[in-house]
Structure formats: C-alpha cells, structure tokens
Amino acid sequence: MSVGGRKLRAMPYFAVRLVHGPGWDASRQIREQDAWDAHAAFMDGLVDDGFVILGGPVDDGHETLHLMEAGGEDEVRARLARDPWASADMLRIGRIEAWALWLDGRSRGLARP
C-alpha cells in the first residue's frame, strides 16, 4: 500500500507508553535512578537496532512515549522485558497501541526553531 506516493512499511508501528513502577524512586531525577547507565545503554541499543524510532518523557515525566517498529505487540513486550529497569520493576508498560503512521516530516529535514 502507498500513501502520497510513499510505500508504507510492512512492519507495523506501535505507540508505547511506559510508566513508573513501584521500584521507581520519586525523590530522584531520572538520570539519578538506580541502574540509569544500564537502562540508557539498553534503550540506545534499541534505537541502534531500529526498534525505537522516537521516544522520551511526556507531561510531568511520570510516563514516556515511544514510537516503535516491531513485528507485533508480543515482540514489543518481549524486548522491553529485557530492560534493566523492567526487571527492577522501575518501569512498566502502561499501554501499547498499533499505529498507522501516515505522516512523517522527519525525512524532509524540517527543523523547528
């Protein structure tokens, strides 16, 4: 299928909300949390693999929103389960939604001031 002359990818996209779990220390900033370096390295690896397309904290920072490209929801869950923060119950999957990404200005090099 194509939209606007662009061919859509066969692999689906997912909007994934991650939320703080009971292991999260609310008195500490994100980069001061236990195992920050291990978590950051893990997430950087997912970016390098092309699994995480975009991501970061939203609103007050109690949740993060990620755009992920995966074969299905099971793959999203399985890969995120390997995050050191998941095993420490610091970060949990709040919601996973399939996302039909039709608009994408990133490839046009449109930078905002």
Question: Residue ranges of each PLM-predicted region?
Answer:
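Conserved, structured core segments of small domains
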Residues: 2-113
